[in-house]
Amino acid sequence: KSKYEATKQKTHSMISKLIKEDISDKKLLLLYDSYGITPEIVREEAVKFGKKINVPENFYARVAELHAKQEQEHATKRGEKLDLANIPETKALYFADYAKSKFKAKIMKVIDNKVILDQTCFYPTSGGQLHDTGTIAGEKVIDVFKQSNVIVHVLSGKHEFPEGEEVECEIDLQRRLQLAKHHTSTHIVNAAARKVLGSHINQAGAKKDIDKATIDLTHYQSITDEELEKIEKEANKLVKESLAVHSNFLPRTEAEQTYGMSIYQGGAVPGKLLRIVSIDGVDVEACGGTHLKNTSEAGEIKILKSAKISDGIVRIYFTAGEAAKKEGKKEKEILEEACRLLHVNIEKLPSAVSNLFDDWKFYKKLNEKLQ
């Protein structure tokens, strides 16, 4: 039984329960967002029950906008809306050069400890990628979020900046580089998982922090250890191939006609213009994150584990770059400590642990008999 057929069988079962009433746009969103079932498969299966399903043309754009709204509410940890009337769109400098760390900007508005600039290199939390930190005129920036098309910088304390004043700003470049490595690696892992597990794989969500990253994938069952090893091997193969990473802006309609709806991989990409990020011959996605210029810049990709987080959705935990090196060092230290405690070298550690477990079972049974 193919993976695609397994997904369709699950869909058939779910639709047989839902078909008694009309499947609304809201239910289509739920099926896609919670179970990884695309509206195209729903429409195909509904025909078998004599039902016609109308899929909105902007379905995937609505999914993206829903994710964007949820993400910003989480990112700002507040439901407040700032009064940004007459404030023009913030010019985002991070698209042109992800490694640019210093820039000058003009103060547009200050609201308590929140600063709006005319242009910025600070990336706001979006697309599952955490915000940048750094300084504005020496004052610490601890959070960055987007309200509509205006980027808001949150300082650690209040500061009186005169509107119109030019200020020198700097982002934490090491943090930015690590986040970029995790973001590009997310696209790489997504492509690797699609190759190993099947073409039904779609990204249902992701998070990129500095220590580790996660990617949620539409898959009908848990991922085995063997499959995880294959995904990691394929991901690192793509890194070693030194593939170019491109980005350009296209009108939404043109992007959809050129690349299809698979460009919507769970990230938040609302708007008429889409930024298309592509890895040569491997992956094409609509994405607004900061990315490397070449897959080789990601360094080693280390997959930590996977977990089934809901029906039809599995999560892969991984690290890349310096974070992967730290993870490897931590694992090495744990192994060395285990060897020290058991008084064996690393080659004999597995058998020593097995013997220890056998001894534990023996004495456990002996203790039960004596009681």
Segments the model singles out, each with a brief description of its role:
Residues 1-371:
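A glycine- and charged-residue-rich anion-binding loop/surface
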